[in-house]
Amino acid sequence: MGLWNKITDNILNIIDLPNFSSEGAYSLRHNGVVLCQGDTEFVKIRQKTDKPGMDVFISGKAKGETVHVPVVVDSSGITDIVYNDFYIEAGADVTIISGCGIHNSGCNENRHDGIHSFHVQKSAAVRYEEKHYGEGDGTGAKVLNPTTNIYLSPNSSFIMDTAQIRGVDSTHRETFIELEENAKLQVIEKLMTDGTQSAVTNMEVVMNGSDSSAQIISRSVAKGTSVQTFHPKAIGKALCHAHIQCDSIIMDQAEVCSIPEINA
C-alpha cells in the first residue's frame, strides 16, 4: 500500500507538475500513508500527532516559493481522511499545489476527504492550485469530498484555482472564507462531469472588513446524465465588493443548477 509505482507517477503528472520530484517543500500522501516529505529554509512541514494530516508553516521570508502536497489513492477500498493546516506568516508570497488523484481497478469505493485550513496573516499573498482526477476500469466509485477553510487577515490576498479534470464519480465540496480589511479573494472553479457523476459545491464568503473584495467564477461542462449544483454565497458585513459568475456548457441529458447569492 505504500509503494511508489507507475500509476503513482502517471497521476502525479496530471494533478501536480510533470516529473514530480522529491525537492523543495513537499509532502506526498499515498493510500493514507506519507511516502516522503521535505522542508526548505522558509517552509516547514510537520505531521500531526493527534489525527491524520500535517501542519505547514510558511515564513514571512518565503518569496516565490512553491509547496507541493499531492495525494494519490490507487488501492481499491480505501477511505482516506486528512486534516491539513497551513500557517502563512505576514509578508509571505507562496504557491501551494495540492490535488488528489484516484485510481480504482476494483469493486470497492475509493474516497479521499481533505480538510484544508489556511491561516493567512497580514499582507501575505497565496496562490492555491488544486486538481482532482479519477481513473481505472473497476466498478468501485471514485469519491472526493474536499472541505476548505480560508481566513484572510488585513491586506492579504488569496487565489484559489480548482479543477476537476475527469473521472470523479461523486464530489461534495464545502468552502468557507472570511476576509478582513482590504483582503482580496479570487476563486476559479473548473469542473467536468460525465455519465452518472454528481458534483455539489457550497461556498460561503464572509467579508467582514472594509474594502475587502471577492471574485468567484465557475466554469463547468456537464455531459451524459451527470448532475451539478453550484451554490456560492457572498455575505457583505462592511463596505466591500463581490462578483459571482457561473458559466456552464450542458450536453446530452445532463443537469446544472447554479444558485449565486449575494447578501449584504
What name fits each language-model region?
Residues 1-49:
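Short, Gly/Pro- and small/polar-rich lid/capping loops
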Residues 36-264:
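Conserved beta-strand/loop scaffold segments within soluble protein domains that form the structured core
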